[in-house]
């Protein structure tokens, strides 16, 4: 009767599969930079390999988990190694899905641009546009869209920065104003002096308004 594989043996397989996954992810990411209108055979192959190897790694981790659960005296270092393998698997799944999504988004955008190009060509002439011209148009439109997105991002960033500066300056002015008022209130007689100045200004304004009114009435009755 064959004995069950040890923790070290199964962990060695997990490490080997992790290395293979990283190599496949590196190859798979190149398709996001050179996306074609349709999925190539090589892209399909790597996509399928990644799904398969990630599934194998889950089986390996399940085996390691079973060994740890069945052995209460398992060392803390092995439990830590198992936890790390789980984290790496989650990270690789996340990277795989992100790359796949990026490839699909880029492919959809290229197909949309190509469709627009064909519609424009069909509306002007019945002759099909040369493939070289279509590729050049797609590349130019892609660059133009990227440049527009960069400009919008910069404008939004500048707007938020300006808003933050205004908010910061407003807080500084409010703080300074509060400090001045607090300081004036601590100085004896300052509040009374300010009240007297305001009262005197009101009296002067009242006298000036009265004189102006009398002059207008005098001119009105003597004209």
From Swiss-Prot:
The keyword RNA-binding does not apply. The modification N-acetylserine is found at residue 2. Belongs to the GOSR1 family. Residues 223 are vesicular. It is a single-pass type IV membrane protein. This is Golgi SNAP receptor complex member 1. Disruption phenotype: Lack of late Golgi SNARE proteins, TLG1 and TLG2. Spores are temperature sensitive and fail to germinate at 37 degrees Celsius. 10 to 20% of cells possess a variety of aberrant structures, including fragmentation of the vacuole, a common occurrence in secretory defects, and substantial accumulation of membranes in some cells. These structures are considered to be abnormal Golgi remnants. Endoplasmic reticulum (ER) retention defective, erd phenotype, which is characterized by hypersecretion of ER-resident proteins. This results from a defect in retrograde directed vesicles. It comes from the Eukaryota. Residues 2-204 are cytoplasmic. It is found in: Golgi apparatus membrane. Keywords: Acetylation, ER-Golgi transport, Golgi apparatus, Membrane, Phosphoprotein, Protein transport, Transmembrane, Transmembrane helix, Transport. The modification Phosphoserine is found at residue 164. GO terms for cellular component: cis-Golgi network; endoplasmic reticulum membrane; Golgi cis cisterna membrane; Golgi medial cisterna; Golgi membrane; SNARE complex. The chain crosses the membrane at residues 205-222. GO terms for biological process: endoplasmic reticulum to Golgi vesicle-mediated transport; Golgi vesicle transport; inter-Golgi cisterna vesicle-mediated transport; intracellular protein transport; vesicle fusion; vesicle fusion with Golgi apparatus. The gene is GOS1. GO terms for molecular function: SNAP receptor activity. InterPro entries: Golgi_SNAP_su1. Component of several multiprotein Golgi SNARE complexes. Identified in a Golgi SNARE complex consisting of t-SNARES SED5, YKT6, and the v-SNARE SFT1. Interacts with BET1. Interacts with BOS1. Interacts with SEC22. Interacts with PEP12. Interacts with self. The lineage of its organism: Eukaryota, Fungi, Dikarya, Ascomycota, Saccharomycotina.
